[in-house]
């Protein structure tokens, strides 16, 4: 089979799979338990002093549920940029400026190592200092600061709670939505925390948001076509972190540039580089590169930090 025939087959396959892959505006899913959780959050907010919202530092905008942002807008808030260890430190500085300009407190965190935990506690107590003093003046001594922690699935919320509470009570897993039941957790003598399950929005209106969530593994790998997700990541890295990609997969820079300069559709050039990575990693099935296996190993490398420190988006 020559290259022309292979391209024709891939084009036909891409056309057949288009309903599953892009555009992301066609993705309309909302598990029933998430609708129930949203209603519960609205009810619980009545007794909450401070909202701690956990975002993924690699995708601060895409990992912020606009629905949750709207229903918590009148509450004091601390923004946690979690998974900071996996993010691009230079780009994160721009995000810090962005949130500060919006009048929000920001903490850089890594829930796996405990980075940012003490700073989060300090910010919660600082933001409530005046209110607690007013309560004390009125004789309400010993009243704890009530904090709600929110975030979409798979941003490291359970690990963060375990760190801040010095316990392992919250069930932790790699799959979205693993923590489902409401629970109050004592942080110290001044703070008690209400955990909530992760909530995604009903429909992804923005194609980039949907793809960023897929790349980081926030939504399940069967929501979007895996090869499309890996393709998008490779394209982004070639434009922004090419040296990371070349180094990880021992790719020859001249060969990659030659492929990219070929007089053919851009998607064909990127696909050839995916094939090259598959060959390098031995992702072969029946004598040919296994696209799905190649896509999975590329995404796994990104999610585990093996492709380096990367942030996928910048403030607008």
Segments and roles (model prediction):
Residues 111, 161, 191-194:
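Conserved active-site beta-strand-loop modules that form the wall/rim of enzyme catalytic pockets
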Residues 84-151, 169, 281-283, 289:
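Canonical P-loop GTPase G-domain recognition
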Residues 146-166, 170, 196:
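Glycine-rich phosphate-binding P-loop
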């Amino acid at each position: 089979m020559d290259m022309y025939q292979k391209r024709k087959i891939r084009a036909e396959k891409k056309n057949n799979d288009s309903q599953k892959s892009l555009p992301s505006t066609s993705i309309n899913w909302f598990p029933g338990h998430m609708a129930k959780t949203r209603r519960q959050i609205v009810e619980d907010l009545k007794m909450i002093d401070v909202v701690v919202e956990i975002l993924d530092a690699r995708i601060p905008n895409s990992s912020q549920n606009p629905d949750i942002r709207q229903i918590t807008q009148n509450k004091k808030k601390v923004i946690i940029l979690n998974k900071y260890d996996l993010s691009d430190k230079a780009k994160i500085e721009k995000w810090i400026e962005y949130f500060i300009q919006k009048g929000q407190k920001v903490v850089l965190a890594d829930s796996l190592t405990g980075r940012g935990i003490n700073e989060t506690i300090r910010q919660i107590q600082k933001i409530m200092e005046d209110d607690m003093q007013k309560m004390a003046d009125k004789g309400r001594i010993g009243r704890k600061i009530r904090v709600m922690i929110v975030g979409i699935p798979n941003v490291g919320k359970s690990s963060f709670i375990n760190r801040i509470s010095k316990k392992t009570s919250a069930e932790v897993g790699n799959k979205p939505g693993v923590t489902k039941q409401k629970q109050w957790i004592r942080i110290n003598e001044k703070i008690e925390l209400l955990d909530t399950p992760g909530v995604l929005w009903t429909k992804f209106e923005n194609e980039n948001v949907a793809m960023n969530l897929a790349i980081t593994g926030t939504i399940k790998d069967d929501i979007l076509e895996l090869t499309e997700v890996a393709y998008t990541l490779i394209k982004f890295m070639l434009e922004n972190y090419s040296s990371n990609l070349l180094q990880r997969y021992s790719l020859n820079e001249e060969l990659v540039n030659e492929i990219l300069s070929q007089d053919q559709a851009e998607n064909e050039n990127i696909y050839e580089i995916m094939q090259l990575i598959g060959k390098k990693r031995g992702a072969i099935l029946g004598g040919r590169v296994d696209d799905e296996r190649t896509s999975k190993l590329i995404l796994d490398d990104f999610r585990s930090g093996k492709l380096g420190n990367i942030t996928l988006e910048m403030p607008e």
